[in-house]
Amino acid sequence: MLSDGVEITSRSGGRFGAYLGKPTTDSAPIVVIAQEIFGITPFIRETVEWLVGAGFGCVCPDLYWRQAPNIELDANVPSEREQALALFRDFDMEAGVNDLSCAIEYARALPFSNGRVAVVGYCLGGALAFDVAARSLADCSIGYYGVGLEKKVSLVPAITRPAMFHMGTKDHYVTEEARSILEEHFGRNKNLSLHWYPVGHSFARSSSPNFDQAATTVANARTLELLAMLKDPS
């Protein structure tokens, strides 16, 4: 069952909306989904449906609520893509992490939550998933094609809970130097797994020109394998 009428209180006292996916069981782990730069789009809602079908509940907060509440942009429309990039440039990452922290707390307290919460993020959300992992805010964190992770590697030693990141070797946001930095630093932490696919940025979004079904299938299977650790023993 899906609902879009949820509100979460921020650290500053403001309230922001979230898209909720209720699990099909009375007790399930909750996945907090961190959006791409385009807002809570059909792709994000499809991701909620996928994870609910896999036995999880979902909370997807509107991370643009301070800048452009409830905005939904089409990555394939040039003017909307430019608008998304402008929002991303002005986005307050620290505020975004705090909002995810509030969403995680909200998720843990839901009546159908088993108390365990993961974060799964894409693009902007993939970078935020790394920050969540570095602060041990969730029980596990997963990022798809997170932007700028090579600038955050000083935080790798702080990651004490399972975290997984899916990256494309043809991602135009990831240089060869950035890839080397990520491989070197991520390899030093046993809690981290880094997976590379021969694809470009946004490879998991079905509407993207870079969409790759084979890579998405493998990445999503790995994601579900990690998330399964949060389920109640059968």
UniProtKB/Swiss-Prot annotation:
It is an enzyme of class 3 (hydrolase). Keywords: Aromatic hydrocarbons catabolism, Hydrolase, Plasmid, Serine esterase. Its EC number is 3.1.1.45. It comes from the Bacteria. InterPro entries: AB_hydrolase_fold, Dienelactn_hydro, Dienelactone_hydrolase-like. Carboxymethylenebutenolidase is specific for dienelactone and has no activity toward enol-lactones. Belongs to the dienelactone hydrolase family. This is Carboxymethylenebutenolidase 1. The gene is tfdEI.
